[in-house]
């Protein structure tokens, strides 16, 4: 009984050319061999068509080249949040101003609002600036709240609330503003209005 050994060889003459397929069949009993070239198969033709264009090939090479990694700052929650009193007035026709300052966060997308006694305040009462870039790709933002001092005769607490994607929970800072000492104007027939126990207003 004759026995045969089949050897398939694949050689690539050039990177942009189709591979050469040759097959050698050897009869081990008669010690005879026959080698012939195989025609291109559909797979080899497909591989030829699938060769990347020079532009695509360049993109691939650039993508596989070892490049120095750039330090990209990940999302960071605000590192500083505080509320300060800008001005306080006791004139019944004037307003007090609170400023909320938030800094050290990334990316710049952030949501800020104010609460008064745990009640969300109308956005018409405050103005929030656009985030400003700090050093190291961090951002900073301010929001100013306007408060009529005659709004309440008691100690009121105002809270600045911040929501950022890097924070697991909402962040907040509060400031209490006592407006029970606001002055009341007394009507007078002559001269400028006066405080009950003080000099006339300029």
From Swiss-Prot:
It holds the Pfam family C1-set. Residues 41-56 have a biased composition (Polar residues). InterPro entries: Ig-like_dom (IPR007110), Ig-like_dom_sf (IPR036179), Ig-like_fold (IPR013783), Ig/MHC_CS (IPR003006), Ig_C1-set (IPR003597), Immune_Resp_Modulators (IPR050380). Residues 66-178 form the Ig-like domain. Residues 32-58 are annotated as: Disordered. PROSITE patterns: IG_LIKE, IG_MHC. This is Ig delta chain C region. The lineage of its organism: Eukaryota, Metazoa, Chordata, Craniata, Vertebrata.
């Amino acid at each position: 009984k004759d026995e045969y050994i089949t050897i398939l060889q694949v050689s690539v003459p050039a990177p942009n050319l189709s591979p050469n397929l040759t097959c050698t069949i050897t009869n081990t009993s008669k010690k005879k061999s026959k080698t012939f070239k195989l025609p291109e198969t559909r797979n080899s033709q497909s591989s030829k068509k699938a060769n990347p264009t020079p532009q695509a090939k360049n993109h691939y090479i650039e993508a596989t080249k070892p490049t120095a990694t750039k330090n990209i700052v990940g999302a960071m929650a605000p590192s500083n949040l505080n509320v300060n009193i800008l001005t306080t007035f006791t004139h019944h026709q004037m307003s007090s101003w609170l400023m909320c300052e938030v800094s050290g966060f990334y990316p710049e997308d952030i949501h800020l609002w104010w609460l008064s006694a745990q009640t969300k305040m109308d956005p018409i009462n405050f103005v929030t600036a656009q985030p400003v870039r700090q050093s190291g790709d961090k951002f900073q933002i301010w929001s100013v709240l306007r408060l009529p001092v005659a709004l309440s005769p008691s100690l009121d607490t105002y809270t600045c609330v911040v929501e950022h994607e890097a924070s697991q929970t909402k962040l907040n800072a509060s400031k209490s503003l006592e407006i029970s000492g606001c002055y009341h104007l007394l009507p007078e027939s002559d001269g400028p209005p006066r405080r009950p126990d003080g000099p006339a207003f300029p």
